[in-house]
Amino acid sequence: MDVLHGHDLYDEQLIDRVGDAVNEDAGDDLDTLEDGQQQQRLGVNRQMDILLDAPQEPPLGVFPAQGGPNGPPRRRKKRSFYTMTKPTPPCQSQEPEMCLLMASVTRAMRHVREDQRGEYFANYLVENMTSQNYPNGMGLPQHWGQF
């Protein structure tokens, strides 16, 4: 911009140096300022130096959209909403809820051969589903699908 006005920065630096030589200065022009102003100016410059020397934040490699050492990023394959896997809720991953009688029947049937399980199941229910074990039907399902 100084070139547009007909002079450049080099000429201004020469003028400052000539002025320093006439005044027998060291060339830093800091001796004309008071001590407080000097320290304040150094502090501002130090802060500016820190800001200018700071790396770019965030680093460019973090965002793949800007490209990187491997070239431009590939487009992601669009997935159908219906084919994406979703985590199952905890209630579906657990065993279904059942009454105490059914739990004990299931546990007992593990020790019986497969061809005898149907008969064993019926006999177990007849023997154990009594009013002594379940007074007034307490603990049994009241309607189909309750447990």
UniProtKB/Swiss-Prot annotation:
Q: Give UniProt keywords alphabetically.
A: Developmental protein, Differentiation, Glycoprotein, Spermatogenesis
**What is the official name of this protein in its record?**
Male-specific protein scotti
What's the stated role of this polypeptide? Post-meiotically transcribed gene that has a role in late spermiogenesis; required for actin cone progression during spermatid individualization.
Q: Which InterPro entries match?
A: Soti
Q: Which gene encodes it?
A: soti
Tissues where this protein is expressed: Expressed in primary spermatocytes and round spermatids. Low expression is seen in very short elongating cysts, but were detected at high levels in a few longer spermatid cysts.
Which Cys-Cys disulphide bridges does the record give? none
The GO annotation for biological process reads: sperm individualization
Region: Disordered, residue numbers:
55-93
List, alphabetically, the Pfam families matched. SOTI
